[in-house]
Amino acid sequence: MRTPAIVLALAPAAAFGQAALWGQCGGQGWTGAKTCVSGAVCQAQNEWYSQCVPGSGGGNPPTPQPTQPSNPPPSTGSGLNAKFKNKGKLYFGTSMDHYDLNKAQLTNIVKAQFGQITNENSMKWDAIEPSRNSFSWTNADAVVNFATANGKLMRGHTLLWHSQLPAWVSNINDRNTLTQVIQNHVTAMVTRYRGKILQWDVVNEIFAEDGSLRSSVFSRVLGEDFVGIAFRAARAADPNAKLYINDYNLDIANYAKVTRGMVEKVNKWVSQGIPIDGIGSQAHLAQPGGWNPASGVPAALRALAAANVKEIAITELDIAGASANDYVTVVNACLQISKCVGITVWGVSDAISWRPNDNPLLYDRNYQPKAAYTAIMNAL
């Protein structure tokens, strides 16, 4: 698989003379090489980023194919995904990662039951670009290749997040440097998987609980501007992927993180031309009586769907105790909202859940379906 040469994007022209295939060759503030190696032509992606793409004499790069038709055909299978798609949705998916690929019980369930995969960790910044301009694709590639081989859609998770962030990024305090680093990282990732990712979580967990921006290197150095920088870079790299803003605690309709945070800010950013296609609600839910039980999800999803975005999705669903009624409540909430295109549960089995004491998933520690699984199947 091709490794983009964007790793050279910040190298001075004097050192390299010409930019390599897929390397940066222009844009506002660019001082590096502005001509491309033989067999490539410099093409402007936007005002701040030009890239060496295959061709000669000014030809365009190959047009990426749409990742998913807007109206998927009915599925003829019998698992969760098939039944959910037959209700008009795009997918019922799960998270997994490269370290799960040798677990036969898990992969067999994924193949039979789920239609979409999210990398749990291997697409996060510390895994992909642990040091500046040094990219490590092996683990992320393994999951994408598994998904492609088995006909599964992919959600890319995540391009910008304050956590699992290398120190070399966290320590940046210069606006221009951080802008270039974001553009380079986002472009490298989205370009590599262009045409293979249905939805990208472009920015993840950027809001504090009061709806303000979370304090992070991105907000401290760039203010709100990092959102537009990241989304525009992602759109330029893959015009067909759906671009999401993703967060947790979006499960109560009148909570500030939903109202003053997600809905208000997204509407403002979309009005400014920032290409935000969707809102992802993680939905790490509590048991009844807890802070954010499943009973709040229907109204919360309606509040999110009222934002000026094309679609919404439940992106990391797990529910403490895995009550059958709670899972059916969430599934029905998505079914009743046309903008809700899919549900992803955050893991296959309680044996590998990040909430091991809550037993929050659809399969138990022995990879056997629980009552919640049966209830969803019956509801569909």
Curated annotation (Swiss-Prot):
Which InterPro entries does this one have?
CBD_sf (IPR035971), Cellulose-bd_dom_fun (IPR000254), GH10 (IPR044846), GH10_dom (IPR001000), Glycoside_hydrolase_SF (IPR017853)
Q: What does this protein do?
A: Endo-1,4-beta-xylanase involved in the hydrolysis of xylan, a major structural heterogeneous polysaccharide found in plant biomass representing the second most abundant polysaccharide in the biosphere, after cellulose.
Region feature Disordered, mapped onto this chain: 53-80
* Cysteine-cysteine disulfides: C334-C340
Pfam families recorded: CBM_1, Glyco_hydro_10
Q: Name one GO biological process term.
A: xylan catabolic process
- Where is the protein situated, by its record's location annotation? Secreted
User: Where does the GH10 domain lie?
Assistant: 74-379
Q: Where is the composition biased (Pro residues)?
A: 61-75
- Please give the catalytic activity noted in the UniProt record: Endohydrolysis of (1->4)-beta-D-xylosidic linkages in xylans
**Induction entry:** Highly expressed both in culture with rice cell walls (RCWs) as a carbon source and in infected rice leaves.
What protein does this entry describe? Endo-1,4-beta-xylanase 6
The stretch of residues making up the signal peptide is: 1-21
Q: What is the lineage of its organism?
A: Eukaryota, Fungi, Dikarya, Ascomycota, Pezizomycotina
Which species is this UniProt entry from? Pyricularia grisea (Crabgrass-specific blast fungus)
